[in-house]
Amino acid sequence: MAPVVPDPRRTKAFATAAAFEKWLAAHHARETELWLQIHKKASGRRTVTYAEALDVALCWGWIDGLKKSFDEESFLQRFTPRTAKSIWSQVNRDHVQRLVTAGRMTKHGQRQVTLAKADGRWAAAYAPIRSASAESIPEDLRAAIDSAHAH
């Protein structure tokens, strides 16, 4: 598989979530992707944060994708419109429920939710991947690990 190279013509930075939302309001229906440049906190430069950008994208029926390093102060996060095959994560379902309650969803974002509920993708949302907790480790394995650490 060839490496993904962001298109500079589709790369933008926004100082605020409101600026990103304004761009999506004007471009959500005709653009196929956006590589959003997000500056790291330590850079001292204010850009929309990943969490803010994800909320805005979900409200407009878009979704995050690949993340690529850009320079020492920032990274690029790819956003695209959801498709009929876009899978949902439980995390994004939770975000959407919060955004609906806050009255932030647009009709475009809500349409994606409605379609996902109708075709089963909403109910099939995958759970977040978490590291194993102590409770999920079999007792015999835990005893062996504890024994090994004791010696």
Placement of each model-derived feature along the sequence:
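Charge-dense, helix-prone N-terminal extensions
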Residues: 1-151
